[in-house]
């Protein structure tokens, strides 16, 4: 049946869970947004996720209970999923589909953009080489985040990655560009407790004033979880490349996103790949992660921190494995450090930032930054090896230098890694690093230059650097 304004499709042949199968609808485009109406006049939203000569498959955004094959009808709303964007989105909270959930009126859109974005010309990409300060010593010194980079956080079930995400969102800045820095925060599959945590944390700390929040709940439809990061990235690209903002996009938890991808793939009866995930998951993740970057001739930038919880702490699981192939390093949240009460429990040894060298050093952070990072890494690794030795032989078998390395490892965890909720500048972080390194003999600081040792060696540890949680 055709009305004056829209065409309706009435031949709904099959309903399976959240999926609707509509016959003779081959002119519907993949990704189109539709409206489903039942016999009582109630409407639901949906998206076309598959089109063939015989039928179109529609993922319903709400429950399908109450839909009847005889009375259900489908009509086209938009040819592709779009989001109305505006600078007024800063300071607002939205659900996973971009609808306001803060009690304020809808945003008056300046543009309506395709949430799949526009491909970024590789030749137009600029080299990422400007340091982003997160205020977290282990990240800023050892695995530095660079503007335009995509640097994931690998966590595990029960670890405080939500608290870490909130701390980064609160503290992150590009030194010298504080006025045009914004955070776009997208959370997928949240429990009610987590929704309350993020809402209260952003409001309590004032971070909401420069942030845009997209919060998808665990009881929302799976397809909404697939749209949420695209809504966030579309907003980020608009703020960055239309208004010149340096935007940090935090996506959590990408494991929930991938499980929604698997759920929908199963409902469509697709042939599964590794551990039941669809074979195209790599391509799908790349379509999100590759939207980070700096474009030549445009002042803004998009930087990404995807956060994922590794099932069974398995870094070879398909989700962290494929994420690692696409992104430029990883920050690893450690269960052992968390068990000691250390926050944030980031282990620098398996962590890596492949673009760190581009954005640190003289004229960017400090001339000794890279060498201090290398020396901390080497000394901490030595201290951990000695801990294993002590567990077997006891401390009597150690030399005096070995005992200093053991104490270094303890101080490194207590003062440098375990900063609690402190917001440290990179200068503060390097000062703490030198204070801990000064416990070692100068002869052991083989990765530091003589000039740097003469200038900074001898700094004293201050108890105020032992982090506490607010």
From Swiss-Prot:
Domain of life, per lineage: Bacteria
CDD domains: ATP-synt_V_A-type_beta_C, ATP-synt_V_A-type_beta_N, V_A-ATPase_B
Short name of any one Pfam family annotated for the protein: ATP-synt_VA_C
Keyword set, alphabetical order: ATP synthesis, Hydrogen ion transport, Ion transport, Transport
Molecular function terms from GO: ATP binding; proton-transporting ATP synthase activity, rotational mechanism
One example of a Gene Ontology biological process annotation: proton motive force-driven plasma membrane ATP synthesis
PROSITE patterns: ATPASE_ALPHA_BETA
NCBIfam families according to UniProt: PRK04196.1
Protein purpose: Produces ATP from ADP in the presence of a proton gradient across the membrane. The V-type beta chain is a regulatory subunit.
Family to which this protein belongs: Belongs to the ATPase alpha/beta chains family.
Protein name in UniProt: V-type ATP synthase beta chain
Native organism: Deinococcus geothermalis (strain DSM 11300 / CIP 105573 / AG-3a)
GN (gene name): atpB
């Amino acid at each position: 049946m055709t009305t004056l304004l829209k065409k309706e499709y009435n031949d709904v042949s099959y309903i399976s869970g959240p999926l609707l199968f509509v016959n003779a609808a081959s002119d519907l485009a993949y990704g189109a947004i539709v409206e489903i109406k039942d016999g009582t006049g109630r409407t639901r939203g949906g998206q076309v996720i598959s089109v063939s000569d015989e039928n179109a498959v529609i993922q319903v955004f709400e429950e399908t209970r109450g839909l009847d094959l005889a009375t259900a009808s489908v009509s086209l709303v938009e040819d592709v999923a779009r989001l109305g964007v505006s600078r007024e989105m800063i300071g607002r909270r939205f659900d996973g589909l971009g609808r306001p959930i803060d009690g304020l009126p809808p945003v008056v859109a300046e543009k309506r953009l395709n949430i799949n974005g526009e491909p970024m010309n590789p030749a137009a990409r600029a080299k990422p080489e400007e340091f982003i300060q997160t205020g977290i010593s282990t990240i800023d010194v050892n695995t530095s985040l660079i503007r335009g980079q995509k640097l994931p956080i690998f966590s595990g079930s029960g670890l405080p990655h939500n608290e870490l995400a909130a701390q980064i969102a609160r503290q992150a800045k590009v030194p010298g560009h504080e006025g045009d820095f914004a955070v776009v925060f997208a959370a997928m599959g949240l429990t009610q407790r987590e929704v309350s945590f993020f809402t209260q944390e952003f409001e309590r700390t004032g971070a909401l004033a420069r942030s845009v929040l997209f919060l998808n709940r665990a009881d929302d439809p799976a397809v909404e979880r697939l749209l949420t990061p695209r809504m966030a990235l579309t907003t980020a690209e608009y703020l960055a490349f239309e208004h010149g903002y340096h935007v940090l996009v935090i996506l959590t938890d990408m494991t929930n996103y991938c499980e929604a991808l698997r759920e929908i793939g199963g409902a469509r009866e697709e042939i599964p790949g590794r551990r039941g995930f669809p074979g195209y998951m790599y391509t799908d993740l790349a379509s999100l992660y590759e939207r980070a970057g700096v474009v030549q001739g445009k002042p803004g930038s998009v930087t990404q921190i995807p956060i994922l919880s590794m099932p069974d702490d398995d870094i070879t699981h398909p989700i962290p494995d494929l994420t690692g192939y696409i992104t430029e390093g990883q920050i690893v949240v450690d269960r052992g450090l968390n068990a000691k009460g250390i926050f944030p429990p980031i282990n620098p040894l398996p962590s890596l930032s492949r673009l760190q060298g581009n954005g640190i050093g003289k004229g960017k952070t400090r001339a000794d930054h890279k060498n201090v990072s290398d020396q901390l890494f080497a000394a901490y690794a030595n201290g951990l090896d000695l801990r294993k030795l002590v567990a077997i032989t006891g401390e009597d078998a150690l030399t005096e230098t070995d005992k200093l390395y053991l104490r270094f490892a303890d101080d490194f965890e207590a003062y440098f890694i375990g900063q609690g909720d402190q917001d440290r500048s990179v200068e503060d972080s390097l000062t703490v690093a030198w204070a801990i390194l000064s416990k070692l003999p100068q002869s052991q600081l083989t990765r530091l230059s003589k000039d740097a040792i003469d200038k900074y060696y001898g700094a004293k540890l201050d108890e105020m650097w032992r982090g506490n949680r607010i």
